[in-house]
């Protein structure tokens, strides 16, 4: 009787435990199913640089295209066979462009050969079909990945796009019975149990890849019997209801492979980019071995922090491949001789923090929601890697030189590079240490702009062709102006010299203060303020005082860039932008920037002002720049404020406008003039970013005239006329002083034929 009772009791307990186990298994199945069939990961927002469009006739030199390829980690080889490889022969570059999901369409690999003639791309040939191409684009560089809510970064690649050599290496080291077991491997568990029992502590694991995946996706790192039971049970469920390739795909994209600051590097695709700078399918076997070796302990075997341990671990992986007959002894020996050859930490995905701040600000304005609500988005920006690199190199070289010369420790800098016509921001830094994230002076620092304000005064005057031309005389007498406060303001020239009068153009070329103030008084303070407002400066930053003509207005480098974009493009405003398009994680276009220009300033006055700025570089305050880059006809303007607190330079070539500011955060003197400070950084920039000649095309109402020493215009040259100026006038007949010129003469012979001609 007792025996039967015990028997029935045990049966009941058995079925109770069985039912409980099945119910718990059902719960785990639902949990796994919902997770894996749903959205497994929230990917971080990826930010890309500019997509480079190549067309025959582009002003791209062979050297510049090589720099673009190297920046995206293309590898030089003798014979191009794989994506990401290139070769050079004479005036050609042959390479296979990687497949890439562009904002509008996915483009496959493309085998191309580019032909160059001097500094111009002349032909693009498709090697596969031997046809010429009229248009071709390079994949952009990944410049940043924004923080994800889970503090994990990854890039997803489907199982069929993983190289088989990587998969074989992983399985050989971590789970060689993966395709045979049912999620767990009992002999491995038993072996690990005995080893740990004998050691008295946990020193060996018996987990399969499936178990490791379960732990990464669902469990914690806490070591306990209960956690191990859950791990085994869930591994059995996962293996029963999902294919081996799906499990492997999840593992390859989930495994922990290092740290980037406070964020984890997850998955082989992103680890490949971080450590080697190239996609996972372009790596060599020894590089796969390093990554697979890091699975055991990414922190311990990090090639950045523990290179010797990482090398030993990599070579051990290679040895195991040799022992399992995946490679020969010779290959094993050869591969072990190779260095780790990893990229310096932060060298590949270098975020350019100042530029990224601008991108994020624009992102929030365009999308209207916090960035965390858009995981996995791709932001395609306007950042030109060549220009950004040139800016950073110029600052890293010149700022230490200037600090040593002036014995300063706290000299700061901001630079912004924009496309002259579209207003796209191609490069930006806000600190003397471009790689550090912090206060962005390019966007936030509001400083007196000094003589950078003068071109706006001359632009305002030249917008009135009935009154002002480049040959207009302006008073250079000392003056004192009584302000509304009752005080007197007495401007002075920099060299404390004065003269009776000076030509308007010469006052701009040599940045003379007194004529500029006199000109602002003559044109009227209201018109000058209206010009600033028209150029996009907020009224709250404008104080309507005569000193505004000499720079008594505080602006940011970003605002200054917008002002000179309008002047530099002939009076057309294109709002500055850093974002071209934003694509959601499912491929939908969330935002597309279509650059639009608004004609807000006189084309003639803008042309004349820009012409004057060309003469500044040719023979004025920026003459030393013009001497070095004479063939490029650059335009520019220096700007230095009182007590040498701030110094500025704006440089303009055929395609870019560059604003440079140097100052100190405590507003103390820099002991630098613009020509010896900001302009020197611009000079250095041009050594890394080859300028394009600035060729000005005069509007129809502007013609070139000769000028004599009295500033009088002539249509024909003689011994007294040694200078030519562009003049805006619809009534050309009333400009010239030539007595022999019938077309342009002021005093014409009014004979019958002349009268008859004018009658009709």
From Swiss-Prot:
InterPro entries documented for this protein: Beta-lactam/transpept-like, Glyco_trans_51, Glycosyltr_51/Transpeptidase, Lysozyme-like_dom_sf, PBP_1b, PBP_transglycosylase, PCN-bd_Tpept, UB2H
Record-annotated membrane-spanning stretches: 9-29
Extracellular side: 30-760
GO molecular function terms noted in the UniProt entry: penicillin binding; peptidoglycan glycosyltransferase activity; serine-type D-Ala-D-Ala carboxypeptidase activity
EC numbers: 2.4.99.28, 3.4.16.4
Transglycosylase: region residues: 136-308
GO cellular-component term (any): peptidoglycan-based cell wall
Major location category of this protein: membrane
Pathway: Cell wall biogenesis; peptidoglycan biosynthesis
Keywords: Antibiotic resistance, Carboxypeptidase, Cell membrane, Cell shape, Cell wall biogenesis/degradation, Glycosyltransferase, Hydrolase, Membrane, Multifunctional enzyme, Peptidoglycan synthesis, Protease, Signal-anchor, Transferase, Transmembrane, Transmembrane helix
Reaction(s) catalysed (UniProt annotation): [GlcNAc-(1->4)-Mur2Ac(oyl-L-Ala-gamma-D-Glu-L-Lys-D-Ala-D-Ala)](n)-di-trans,octa-cis-undecaprenyl diphosphate + beta-D-GlcNAc-(1->4)-Mur2Ac(oyl-L-Ala-gamma-D-Glu-L-Lys-D-Ala-D-Ala)-di-trans,octa-cis-undecaprenyl diphosphate = [GlcNAc-(1->4)-Mur2Ac(oyl-L-Ala-gamma-D-Glu-L-Lys-D-Ala-D-Ala)](n+1)-di-trans,octa-cis-undecaprenyl diphosphate + di-trans,octa-cis-undecaprenyl diphosphate + H(+); Preferential cleavage: (Ac)2-L-Lys-D-Ala-|-D-Ala. Also transpeptidation of peptidyl-alanyl moieties that are N-acyl substituents of D-alanine
Homology family: In the N-terminal section; belongs to the glycosyltransferase 51 family.
Function noted in UniProt: Cell wall formation. Synthesis of cross-linked peptidoglycan from the lipid intermediates. The enzyme has a penicillin-insensitive transglycosylase N-terminal domain (formation of linear glycan strands) and a penicillin-sensitive transpeptidase C-terminal domain (cross-linking of the peptide subunits).
Name the record gives this protein: Penicillin-binding protein 1B
Organism listed in the record: Buchnera aphidicola subsp. Acyrthosiphon pisum (strain APS)
């Amino acid at each position: 009787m007792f025996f039967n009772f015990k028997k029935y009791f045990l049966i009941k307990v058995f079925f109770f435990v069985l039912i409980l186990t099945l119910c718990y298994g059902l719960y785990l199945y639902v949990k796994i199913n919902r997770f894996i069939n749903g959205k497994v990961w929230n990917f971080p927002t990826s930010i890309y640089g500019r997509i480079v469009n190549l067309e025959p006739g582009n002003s791209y030199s062979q050297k510049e295209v090589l720099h673009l390829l190297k920046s995206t980690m293309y590898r030089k080889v003798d014979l191009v066979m794989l994506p990401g490889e290139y070769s050079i022969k004479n005036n050609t570059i042959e390479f296979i462009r990687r497949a890439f999901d562009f904002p509008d369409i996915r483009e496959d690999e493309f085998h191309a050969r580019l032909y160059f003639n001097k500094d111009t791309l002349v032909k693009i040939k498709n090697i596969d079909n031997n046809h010429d191409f009229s248009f071709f684009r390079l994949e952009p560089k990944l410049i940043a990945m924004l923080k994800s809510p889970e503090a994990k970064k990854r890039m997803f690649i489907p199982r069929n796009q993983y190289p088989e050599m990587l998969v074989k290496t992983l399985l050989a080291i971590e789970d060689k019975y993966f395709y045979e077991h049912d999620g767990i491997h009992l002999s491995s568990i038993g072996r690990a149990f005995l080893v740990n029992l004998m050691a008295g502590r946990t020193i060996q694991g018996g987990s399969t890849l499936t178990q490791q995946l379960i732990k990464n996706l669902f469990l914690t790192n806490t070591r306990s019997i209960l956690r191990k039971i859950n791990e085994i049970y869930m591994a059995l469920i996962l293996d029963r209801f999902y294919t081996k390739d799906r499990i492997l795909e999840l593992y390859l994209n989930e495994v922990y492979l290092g740290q980037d600051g406070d964020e984890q590097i997850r998955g082989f695709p992103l680890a490949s980019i971080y450590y080697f700078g190239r996609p996972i399918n372009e790596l060599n076997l020894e590089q796969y071995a390093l990554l697979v070796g890091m699975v055991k302990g990414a922190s311990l075997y990090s090639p950045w922090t523990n290179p010797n341990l990482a090398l030993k671990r990599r070579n051990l992986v290679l040895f195991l491949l040799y022992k399992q007959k995946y490679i020969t002894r010779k290959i094993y020996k050869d591969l072990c001789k190779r260095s780790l050859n990893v990229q310096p930490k932060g060298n590949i995905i270098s975020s350019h923090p100042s530029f990224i701040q601008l991108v994020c600000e624009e992102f929030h304005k365009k999308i209207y929601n916090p960035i965390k609500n858009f995981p996995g988005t791709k932001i395609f920006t306007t950042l030109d890697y060549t220009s950004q690199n040139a800016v950073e190199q110029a600052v890293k070289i010149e700022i230490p030189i200037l600090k040593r010369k002036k014995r300063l420790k706290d000299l700061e800098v901001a630079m912004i590079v924009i496309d002259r016509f579209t207003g796209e921001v191609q490069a930006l830094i806000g600190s003397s240490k471009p790689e550090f994230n912090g206060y962005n002076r390019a966007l936030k620092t509001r400083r007196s702009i000094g003589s950078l304000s003068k071109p706006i005064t001359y632009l305002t005057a030249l917008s009135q062709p009935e009154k002002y031309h480049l040959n207009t005389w302006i008073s250079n007498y000392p003056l004192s102006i009584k302000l509304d406060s009752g005080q007197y303001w007495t401007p002075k020239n920099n060299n404390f010299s004065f003269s009776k009068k000076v030509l308007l153009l010469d006052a701009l070329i040599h940045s003379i203060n007194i004529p500029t103030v006199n000109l602002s008084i003559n044109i009227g303070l209201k018109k000058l303020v209206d010009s600033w407002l028209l150029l996009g400066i907020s009224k709250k930053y404008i104080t309507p005082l005569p000193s505004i003509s000499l720079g008594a207005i505080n602006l940011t480098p970003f605002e200054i860039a917008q002002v000179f974009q309008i002047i530099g493009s002939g009076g057309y405003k294109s709002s500055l932008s850093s974002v071209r398009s934003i694509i959601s994680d499912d491929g939908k276009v969330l935002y597309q920037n279509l650059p639009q220009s608004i004609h807000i300033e006189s084309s003639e006055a803008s042309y004349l002002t820009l012409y004057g700025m060309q003469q500044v570089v040719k023979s004025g305050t920026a003459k030393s720049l013009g001497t070095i880059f004479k063939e490029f006809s650059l335009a520019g303007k220096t700007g230095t404020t009182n007590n040498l607190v701030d110094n500025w330079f704006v440089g303009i070539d055929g395609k870019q406008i560059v604003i440079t500011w140097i100052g100190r955060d405590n507003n103390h003197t820099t002991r630098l003039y613009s020509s010896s400070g900001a302009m020197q950084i611009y000079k250095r920039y041009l050594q890394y970013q080859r300028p394009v000649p600035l060729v000005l095309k005069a509007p129809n109402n502007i013609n070139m005239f000769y000028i004599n020493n009295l500033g009088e215009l002539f249509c024909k040259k003689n011994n007294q006329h040694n200078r030519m100026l562009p003049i805006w006038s619809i009534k050309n007949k009333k400009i010239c002083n030539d007595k022999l010129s019938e077309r342009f003469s002021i005093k014409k012979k009014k004979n019958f034929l002349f009268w008859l001609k004018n009658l009709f």
